[in-house]
């Protein structure tokens, strides 16, 4: 594993995980509101 590749992928992975977390949280709020 190249260290430079890891340095590039880490922020991208963090941003993707954060986005998915926020989308999931909002989706749960919408589902609770609907039911």
UniProtKB/Swiss-Prot annotation:
Leader sequence residues: none
Q: How does it sit in the membrane?
A: Single-pass membrane protein
Q: Which UniProt keywords apply?
A: Chloroplast, Membrane, Photosynthesis, Photosystem II, Plastid, Thylakoid, Transmembrane, Transmembrane helix
Q: Name one GO biological process term.
A: photosynthesis
Q: Give the stretches traversing the membrane.
A: 5-23
Origin superkingdom? Eukaryota
- InterPro entries recorded: PSII_PsbY (IPR009388)
Its Gene Ontology cellular component terms are: chloroplast thylakoid membrane; photosystem II
Q: Which cysteines are joined by disulfide bonds?
A: none
**Keyword Glycoprotein tagged:** no
Q: Which residues does the entry place in the Stromal compartment?
A: 24-35
Q: Name one GO molecular function term.
A: manganese ion binding
Q: Which residues lie on this side of the membrane: Lumenal?
A: 1-4
Q: Where in the cell is it found?
A: Plastid, Chloroplast thylakoid membrane
Q: Summarize subunit and interaction data from the UniProt record for this chain.
A: PSII is composed of 1 copy each of membrane proteins PsbA, PsbB, PsbC, PsbD, PsbE, PsbF, PsbH, PsbI, PsbJ, PsbK, PsbL, PsbM, PsbT, PsbX, PsbY, PsbZ, Psb30/Ycf12, at least 3 peripheral proteins of the oxygen-evolving complex and a large number of cofactors. It forms dimeric complexes.
What is this protein for, i.e. what is its function? Loosely associated component of the core of photosystem II (PSII), it is not always seen in crystals. PSII is a light-driven water plastoquinone oxidoreductase, using light energy to abstract electrons from H(2)O, generating a proton gradient subsequently used for ATP formation.
Tell me the protein family, please: Belongs to the PsbY family.
Q: What is this protein called?
A: Photosystem II reaction center protein Y
């Amino acid at each position: 594993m190249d260290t430079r590749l890891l340095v590039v992928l880490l922020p991208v992975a963090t941003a993707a995980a954060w986005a998915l977390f926020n989308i999931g949280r909002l989706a749960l709020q919408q589902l609770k509101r609907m039911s």
